[in-house]
From Swiss-Prot:
Amino-acid positions noted as binding S-adenosyl-L-methionine in the UniProt annotation, renumbered to this chain: 35, 60-62, 84-85, 125, 192
NCBIfam families: carboxy-S-adenosyl-L-methionine synthase CmoA
Lineage of source species: Bacteria, Pseudomonadati, Campylobacterota, Epsilonproteobacteria, Campylobacterales
GO molecular function: carboxyl- or carbamoyltransferase activity; S-adenosyl-L-methionine binding
Name of protein: Carboxy-S-adenosyl-L-methionine synthase
Alphabetized PANTHER family for the sequence: CARBOXY-S-ADENOSYL-L-METHIONINE SYNTHASE, TRANS-ACONITATE 2-METHYLTRANSFERASE-RELATED
Subunit structure: Homodimer.
Protein EC: 2.1.3.-
InterPro entries: CmoA, Methyltransf_25, SAM-dependent_MTases_sf
The organism of origin for this protein: Sulfurovum sp. (strain NBC37-1)
Top-level taxon of origin: Bacteria
Gene field: cmoA
Amino acid sequence: MKDKVFEKPIEKKFEFDQAVASVFDDMLSRSVPFYDEVRHLVISLILAEQREGMKVLDLGASTAKFLLDLHSKMEAGMQLKGIDNSPAMLERAEQKCQAFGASIDLALADMMEYSYEEEDIIVANYTLQFIRPMQRIELVKRLYESLNEGGMFIFSEKVVFEDKRLDKEMIDIYYDYKKTQGYSEYEIAQKREALENVLIPFTIEENIRMCRDAGFRNISTIFQWANFVTFVAKK
């Protein structure tokens, strides 16, 4: 279904409700530059590490698109889990997993309150940016503690730049990109207003520092397009 959420005047801040869940896959593919390519990149990285019984947790699993893609490509019997705090998203995720016959453990949970078990890989695709900065830092510390030695935390984020002129230029370039994906200036402005104080991005340096302060020692960026970046932090 095509994303038309912001064609009408907004009445509330952005949230992952039924209206968003129904068009979320389209929203991601048209709103996040190279979303499909990054998803495939992260899956390839996980598959390079795959082994029987390896545990993979997706934070903010939404409609389970990432986990289903990973499930369809894996050869070893990995244990796939996903959590999301949106009932509407989880409902769609469960429907899709059932339709594809995929054995994926899904849970309705808040990332800040979830009881993390030992994991080998944790993935967060454009998820941390919706968590308040101080809570975000505490969450990453908990993720580090839950990872087994040698484990990986792979996350993608929208970022800001300390250079204000460069930051504005990157935002303008991104909005031009959205226009090429069929979004009108009105829709772009509506979504920008809805996300105000909901999506709070860090700089690249702040994301790296957050991981380092949590205990990660090997932190790399493996993809960047303008103000969209994918990081890998190893324990």
